[in-house]
């Protein structure tokens, strides 16, 4: 649950009194005491490009006994701000909910708006949305693979994937001028079109990106000293995946045949 902000409905997951101030770093964290047991606190401000979060590890050597995650630093009261809309600012608020998923959030909002209005985006508009969604998905997954490599201290793949993620973001900028896809998806369709010359350039960049990504990622899986650090770490049972409603690679890794692109 969000530790540092009440929801706009005032139902506090931590059951704190309404008149109690909520301040970052004020609260009880789980602790493990013992000889050579140490605590590692990370965040909420990180050196990379990830959004803020506080992670507190209780460790013994390389064994992690307990991890507590405190989120909520990015909560800005947007749900409450959206009440009474839509208006001219609504789509811009939706696009800035999270930097990694501007296109996905904008598409979800537009699909809801179109369904309520009884209309649909044009076939070309839907195709351009689909391209932008796939580019956003690629950037996220490539970035995550690089981050995983960094987590096990395998810097070659971490560095390569960071650069390749930037190449994918630049492809999105080729479509609409924004590396995060802002301004592209709009109710009823899209805000930008793409001619044949631009699509040919996009295809050329995609081919180059695929080759680079395969080399960078296969390099990680061919390095036994890196692979061994992933073994038996973070495995999620299928039943838990169903209970949590996991989707995407996290769901498919547990054996669930889920793909929102196919299922919607």
Tell me the role of every PLM-derived stretch.
Residues 1-264:
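Active-site bordering "gate/hinge" segments
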């Amino acid at each position: 649950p969000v530790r540092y902000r009440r929801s706009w409905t005032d139902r506090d997951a931590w059951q704190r009194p309404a008149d109690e101030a909520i301040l970052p770093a004020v609260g009880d964290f789980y602790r493990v005491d013992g000889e050579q047991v140490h605590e590692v606190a990370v965040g909420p401000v990180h050196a990379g490009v990830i959004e803020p979060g506080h992670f507190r590890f209780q460790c013994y050597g390389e064994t992690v006994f307990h991890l507590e995650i405190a989120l909520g630093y990015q909560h800005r009261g947007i749900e409450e701000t959206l009440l009474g809309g839509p208006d001219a600012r609504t789509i811009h608020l939706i696009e800035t909910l999270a930097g990694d998923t501007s296109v996905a959030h904008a598409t979800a909002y537009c699909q809801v708006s179109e369904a309520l209005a009884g209309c649909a985006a044009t076939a070309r508009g839907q195709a351009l949305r689909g391209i932008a969604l796939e580019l956003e998905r690629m950037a996220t997954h490539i970035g995550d693979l690089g981050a995983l490599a960094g987590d096990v201290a395998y810097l070659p793949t971490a560095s390569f994937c960071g650069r390749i993620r930037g190449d994918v973001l630049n492809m999105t900028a080729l479509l609409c001028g924004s590396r995060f896809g802002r301004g592209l998806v709009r109710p009823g369709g899209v805000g930008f079109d793409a001619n044949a010359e631009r699509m040919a350039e996009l295809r050329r960049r995609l081919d180059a990106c695929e080759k680079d990504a395969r080399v960078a990622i296969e390099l990680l899986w061919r390095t036994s000293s890196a692979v061994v650090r992933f073994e038996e770490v973070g495995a999620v049972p299928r039943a838990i995946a169903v209970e949590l409603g996991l989707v995407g690679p996290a769901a498919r890794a547990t054996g669930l045949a889920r793909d929102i692109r196919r299922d919607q």
